[in-house]
Amino acid sequence: PSLVGSEMCIRDSYFFFGRSRRRERIIGQKIYNRLLNKPMVEYLAQDATTLPMAYSRLISLFRNTTQAFPFDGNRIEIYTNGGSMLQSLLRELQNARQHIHIEFYIFEDDAIGRMVRDVLVEKARAGVEVRLIYDDVGCWHVPNRFYDEMLSAGIEVRSFLKVRFPLFTSKVNYRNHRKIVVIDGRVGFIGGMNLAERYMRGFSWGIWRDTHLLLEGKAVHGLQTAFLLDWYFVDRTLISASRYFPKMEATGTSLVQIVTSDPIGPWKEIMQGLSMAISGAKKYFYIQTPYFLPTEQILAAMQTAALAGVDVRLMLPMRADNRLTHLGSCSYLADILQAGVKIYFYKKGFLHSKLMVSDDELSTVGSTNVDFRSFEHNFEVNAFIYDTETALQMREIFLQDQRDCVQVFLKNWVKRPWWRKAAESVVRLMAPLL
């Protein structure tokens, strides 16, 4: 069953040109339209794209709220550890000929960060345009000298929402949690990994388990648009030349939407999409997240799906990198166990993966955690993939991780010590702030 994408062009045009939103008022309607014009033209120029009927409403939701155009013919590589992702990233950076756009929440001054920085410097000195956005809070402890060599090589470096006095400004709440790399407008990276040693080497007590993607194809237009909107936000420079959106032939078979969410628009796009996807699941919906502080909307969707007989599974780290957040996460588990959600604690190390997969058809990977901060306060980005081959790979990754888990059962979970339950309840009150 299918839906022909070209049937929605009129509605696409309305939502593209007709919506008045706070985000557009901040960035400027004309700027917003110009930045989105190139990917829209490429989207409309596609052959009549066959969209999966089961997800036509989800695809429409993302198009109507974030102008996230669904592009087909993409190739996807999945990385489940930092070493393989870093190796691929360095290789693709070395292959850059025209431009590199790179955006991370954390870009650490350590062996891994310096390795990537040195490649960026080398490419900039060879004439490649390089632009970097880092989050000011995520990189709070990174010394200025780390960026000096990049600046001296001609790399344009910008911090996102610079914070001078973190204890006295609300800006500290609104952080850019995105992880985006775009190379020559043709290859992109998106996922949960930042640039720091711990993402590659883990901790003394276990590995760092994460998920990241390489995308090749027109879906990179979505990553490019997200980066250039953020670049305009931090630099007030409009970059929209055609060379940043090259014409491409199909390199694979995956249909992909790049979906962003932020605290300055009227919608909670990724949260709304996940709620719809969970509610629409027919057979199963599997979730990996390092933190589980769900909004009422997500909590209700998970409970309702499980009560309706859908196999809903949640995988969390047994040991987290933030004890408060982990306590808060644990406070919600009885609520979903009672509804029949299966819960697994990953015991091999720290699970930082933000992977979800459903019904062998839909999967998503990105920067978004299942928590208030990601849904309400952060600038986030996810790839939503409508493709059976990719979904089966994601499902196998989840099931492989499940072998390194211990399952949580309600009859045992309710026997936690009273002081543990009390601590969880107190932290839960602070969930929107964590």
Per-segment meaning from a language model:
Residues P1-S6, I10-Q272, M276, G280, ...:
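N-terminal localization/anchoring segments of enzymes in phospholipid and broader phosphate metabolism
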Residues G265, E269, T289, L293, ...:
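A short glycine-/small-residue-rich loop at the edge of a beta-strand within enzyme catalytic domains
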Residues A281-K283, Y291-R313, P317-N322:
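Helical hairpin unit composed of two closely spaced alpha helices linked by a short loop
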Residues A308, V312-S358:
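A beta-strand-loop signature enriched in Asp, Gly, Thr, and Trp
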Residues M271, I278, L299, V312, ...:
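A general structural signal for well-ordered alpha-helical packing
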